C-alpha cells in the first residue's frame, strides 16, 4: 500500500499553478480571473467559497465573489452570468451549488459559456469529456486524480478505499 501525502501534493500543485499564472500574466499582460457566484448563506458553501478564494489569490489569480441572498430571482443570476460571459477580465465562472429550489440549476449551468465553465458541468463540456475531446474536467474528479498523479504510478496499479 502506498500512502499519498496530500499536503505535499497540494503544495507542489500550488507552486506549479503559481508559475503557470505568472507565465500567463507575462505572456498576455493580464491576470486570469475566477468569479464565484454564491447564493444564500449555507455555512458549508460559504466555507468552500472562502477556501476557493484563498487558493485562487495564493496562486496569483484575480478572485471575485458575488453574493446574493437565497431570495434572489433566477433572472438576476442569469443576467449576471451573461454579463460575466462577456467580461474579458473573467477567465472562469463558478456558481456554488446547491442552489435554492426556485432557481433552475440546469438553466444556470447552461447559461455559463463553456469556455468559462470552471466546474465542467455545461452540457458541451460534459459531452466533450465523455467523447474524449478536450474540455474542462469537473473539479471533484480532478481533485481526486491530481494527488494520485504525483505518485507517478500508473492508474491500473492503484487501489483506493
Over which residues does each language-model region extend?
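Short beta-strand segments enriched in small/hydrophobic residues
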Residues: 31-41
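Short, solvent-exposed amphipathic alpha-helices that sit
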Residues: 46-59
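Short beta-strand elements in bilobed, periplasmic/extracellular small-molecule ligand-binding domains
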Residues: 56-68
